[in-house]
Amino acid sequence: MADLKALAEAIIKGDQNTAVEITKSALKEGAAAKSILEDGLIAGMDVIGSRFKKNEVYIPEVLIAARAMKMAMELLAPALAKAGVKPVGKFLIGTVQGDLHDIGKNLVAMMLKGAGFEVTDLGVDIGPEKFIERARATSSQLIGLSALLTTTMPGMEKTIKALRAAGVTAKIMIGGAPVTQGYADKVGADGYAPDAASAVDVAKRLVA
């Protein structure tokens, strides 16, 4: 019987080799792909997420755990597709035009993947047109806009207005160091997250 508790532990520790080995043997033993995902990988990332919120672990530990999850997911993805396991939701993310910062955005993308979302990461310095085009192409239910500078924050409002004018109905979340709940309300965003772990909670709430 596959030890999915040990798989969750391997993710928490960021032990890529063990995570991959347990995923391999679980698949070989015929464990359900959905169970490997939820009771192993997502369970481990959930623990990391809540520890991150409490400042018990920091960005390097989260990145190491996310990397272990990514390696295991590469093995698991074909089995999930075959079993018809759907993602929790489809999430499109990018840093707005004029802003080249990506650490926070990358962290949010990793945490969302860790929570079972299908994530399309557009990268940095993304204009409204690109967001519109990819939102349509991916049928994303959620769009995340990131900005790390007060000077690039207006790009969020511009992008939200453009998305709405183009008829994109996806829920829009914003975040980044200078961003606040007040600003999110002002520019008409559907959600705001102060950090990567909270972003997962907000995203889950918006797709529920």
What are these regions (language model features)?
Residues I42, Q97-D99, P178:
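Short glycine-enriched loops at secondary-structure junctions
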Residues Y58, L100-H101, T152:
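Alpha-helix N-cap/loop-to-helix initiation residues
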Residues V108-A115, T120-A189, S198-K204:
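Cofactor-cradling patches in redox/metallo enzymes
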Residues M1-A81:
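Long amphipathic alpha-helical segments
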Residues V88-L122:
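Glycine-rich active-site/cofactor-binding loop and its immediate structural neighborhood
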Residues L80, G84-G89:
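Immediate post-signal peptide segment of exported/extracytoplasmic ligand-binding proteins
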